[in-house]
Amino acid sequence: MKNKFNFKIFTGNLAIIIYIALATTICHLIISENYGYFLDEMYTMACSQHLSLGFVDIPPVAPALLWLITTLFGNSLFVIHLLPALFSGAAVVVVGLMVKELGGGRLAMGLAALAAAFVPVWMAVGSLYTYDFLDQFIIMLLFYFLIKLIKSENNKLWLAIGAIAGIGLMTKPSMIFFIAGLALAVLVTKHRKMYATRWPWMGAGIALIIILPALIWQMGNGFPIVEYWGAYSAGKAVHASAVEFVLMQVVGMNVFLLPLWLMGLYYVLFDKEGKKYRLLGVTFAILFFVFLVTGAKMYMLIPAYAMLLAGGAIFVERFASKIIKKMLIAVYACLIMITGVIQAPNFMPILPVDSLVQYYDTIGGLFGTKSIRLDNNTQVELPQYFYDRLEWDVLVDDVTEVYNSLSGEERADTAIVTQNYGWAGAIDLFGADKGLPKATCGQLNYYFFSMEHIGRKTWITIGESQEEMQKVFDSVTAAKISRTVYRKPGETLILICRGPKFTVDEALQAIKKFE
């Protein structure tokens, strides 16, 4: 009997999901070498060279995966962006599979997958290697297994949910919000009876086992993660008003997807067929309220919309029996694609930088603001996720020039010091080929693996105040100002500091910056 290749995957109901997912991944790979390394990518690369279960802000999963792929294939921009591109396609597949589990057909799966491909936030995270692309995917996967749990009533699936939650916590700590939201939603719905079985608790036990080594490390080091998130909430994050938060949800999800996910929310809360999955809607409502009142970053809630897109697509499919309705749905799908393509340069490195500036002066203003608000008092011409990929070579070349101006004897006793992990990451990534020592940096995870040179007698500092350095060194010389066109702050002061007035222990205490 001859074995025949099964072409069903290319022609069956799942085919449309596969095609959209492949197109999503390919698009990300095509632009993967545009611009340069993002500062968080360079930081994660540095963390990947010092793998540890302990962390201040980045848990070990993202650095470990980056270590694996760069060890195998190098650290080119294409390689760095390979996993985000693949996971972007995988996220499209998960949304499509949610539809399948909810009972949707080919039209619903195609519509939901298409919508997922053009969610602006997912377009953005798919073009960067940060923990966000993993976090978004893992949360979607958690909700997918939650749908399977509700549908099958197989409580053993709590074990899978627990494992996913544990991996999620070791990817990004904000997973705790989704775990807590789900736990509360189970408690206030009919599914509370699940707590009378052993399976949710065994799932929680699996999650605890996964995070236990990191938890022990945190306890032994004074919980630096608590210090970090406290500082992050107090100063760095934009504190959006309730109106701003809601508007950012609409824009971040693509304005034209608003009716789709609203129908999805109605479907899982009130629809005769969909209310079986009310737990999904209640979980979403709890998360929405928590993030609303805390002024959270708008993208934190975005992965929870995956299940709403799935529900909305099923709701739409139900009314697509007649040709006219199918034509209207086709028009709606085209609108999603067109607006997604128009918005894409706002979230992906597609346009040349000069053209990008022109884009923000014209089309970009239709879908957001020309100046993107990052921190509480900062206005910029380009979004931070773009400008922090640019002109790192300028900074490293300027530091190299200052370093090479020293005598060989002094260079041997010189540290390059900064409290900005982006600058430190650039020195580590590009400086080795120029003969620079590894950077010394007190910010976040860098504090635990970059203190080797802190006792050296000459410091080249990046971005420090000359007046402040004069208080702690005998001699401070302004060596150079590094100037950039797009990357902020635009001018960065490079100092040569000689004769430290402090001990190594005092330096270790002063340089620590968990924010």
Name what the model sees in each region:
Residues 21, 112-120, 165, 169, ...:
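Short helix- or helix-capping micro-motifs
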Residues 318-358:
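Signature aromatic-anchored transmembrane alpha helix within multi-pass, membrane-resident enzymes
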Residues 18, 82-103, 141, 145:
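Transmembrane-helix motifs of polytopic, lipid-linked glycan transferases
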Residues 31-44, 54-66, 74-78:
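Extracytoplasmic catalytic/substrate-binding loops of multi-pass membrane glycan-assembly enzymes
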Residues 176-277, 341-349:
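Transmembrane-lumen/periplasm boundary regions of multi-pass, lipid-linked membrane glycan transferases
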Residues 121-135:
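Short acidic/glycine- and proline-prone juxtamembrane loop motifs at membrane-interface regions
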Residues 100-103, 142-157, 265-274:
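Membrane-interface transmembrane helices that cradle and orient dolichyl/undecaprenyl
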Residues 107, 145-166, 197, 201, ...:
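Short hydrophobic alpha-helices at membrane interfaces in multi-pass membrane enzymes
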